[in-house]
Amino acid sequence: TKLFNAGDIQGATDLLESSASLFEVADAKTLNKKTYLEAQIDQANKNFSAAFEKFTAFKAANGVNANYDNQVQLLTSDIVNSAIEDNAEKRFSEAAVKLYLAYQINPEVNKDYLYYAASSSVNATEFEISLSYYLKLKEINYDGITKQYLAKSVATGEDVELTESEFDLYKKTNDYSDYREENTESKLPEIIKNIALIYVQLGDNEKAMSAVKE
């Protein structure tokens, strides 16, 4: 752990490998620490799937680490940032895999990443994969609706979108007027349309028609 915290990832990896025989007789607490460190090393090396598997194993073995939640959140951020880079470089298939992994880390909270995974899969022309993602989005009634905080700039007369904290703060100034909260449009109609289009792409016009009728 000291080597890893000092930034010596390779040193930490080598130490784990050279200590393999010691871990064969180690207690559960020590083994959990080993699993956690291995997960951190995988994350640092961008082996995201392996990192998630080890963090999951750590939690399943009742491992305790005060930084666990923050570390998993950081893992999610690392995965998403890597997927953004992949999309920018047109590595859509790789991006889709990572975004789906980000969704799996916390399906209740990270539904947006499933939506983006579906989109990346379409761009990768992996239609059967994208279809499975869109069908899952439909199944969980994902609408992607978010709240927007809007105000009109007194200087320009144009609407601007603010963060929630800016929205609350700027109300105390005279720089903006016409403060309002609005919801974005539902993404569900787009999801249904994409399901139908993919069925057409796959040559199943009957299911395409059925999807539209729903």
Role assignments for model-derived ranges:
Residues E38, S82, Y116-A117, I195:
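Structural register within alpha-helical repeat arrays
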Residues I9, F48, F92-S93, F127, ...:
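TPR-repeat structural position
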Residues E17, E24, E53-T56, Y100-L101, ...:
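Alpha-solenoid helical repeat scaffolds
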Residues L3, D42, D86, S120-S121, ...:
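Residue at a conserved register position within TPR or TPR-like alpha-solenoid repeats
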Residues S21-T30, A61-V72, Y103-E108, I140-L188, ...:
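Flexible helix-coil transition and linker loops at the boundaries of alpha-helical arrays
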